[in-house]
């Protein structure tokens, strides 16, 4: 069994896929992701979908990062949505088909 820690993916699905191909997680492995799955990179949606797939093959502990927190706060009125959009939220929205 291995414990694998991954941080700051930031919407970079190609890099995540390369990493997953390299480490080739098995059902005995534990992966801890440190948040910041979204924003900045071109495929936040793909990153989220890939992590959901990974969770069916091994134990995954996804933690929330500051970018996920900022997105949630902007949706709940805790921070200006423009702050989130300026910090990579635009790329996240585009990955879900919003322009």
What feature does the model see in each segment?
Residues 1-50:
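N-terminal active-site segment of His-dependent metallophosphoesterases
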Residues 40-99:
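Active-site neighborhood of divalent metal-dependent phosphoester bond hydrolases
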């Amino acid at each position: 069994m291995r414990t694998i820690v991954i941080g700051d993916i930031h919407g970079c699905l190609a890099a995540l896929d390369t990493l997953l191909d390299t480490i080739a997680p098995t059902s005995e492995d534990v992966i801890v992701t440190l948040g910041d799955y979204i924003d900045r990179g071109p495929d936040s949606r793909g990153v989220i979908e890939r992590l959901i797939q990974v969770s069916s093959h091994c134990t995954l502990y996804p933690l929330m990062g500051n970018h996920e927190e900022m997105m949630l706060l902007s949706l709940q009125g805790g921070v200006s949505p423009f702050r989130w959009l300026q910090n990579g939220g635009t790329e996240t929205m585009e990955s879900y088909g919003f322009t």
